[in-house]
């Protein structure tokens, strides 16, 4: 989600299939310098693609002697996925970052063969993307400042699916699990658990 001079990216940590939960600590967002890459899809391909881009970004940093920009990372992801178009990775990447030269936020998404979907407001990906589009359209506002962008991402979206101490129910995909907040943020009278 894009705000005014800021960007926020969020995901769940659940690894599973329908009602079967394998892990509650599976990373899906990876940081490459100042750029964040979110990967949804097949777990083995998520691990493979994240390692592949870690290697390519490190090679870029050594060759160019600077960190990769979000736009360059988008082109790298697109060309790398297109190389494997006849045997694609089953992932749907999302890139979020701030261009260090212009200071402008940048987000984009991809399909499994590298077609770039640029956006100026928000990008969603994964099994619940159809439902998340409606939720994000209702909650996104132009020119959100940085703390408000995080509040929208964490507070509004997550509190609509979780009670304060009850079970966390993923209304979009139908998986239920016990809700245990990992961190609590107090903002005035509002308390956010995530």
Language-model-derived ranges and their functions:
Residues 1-194:
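Long, low-complexity N-terminal extensions
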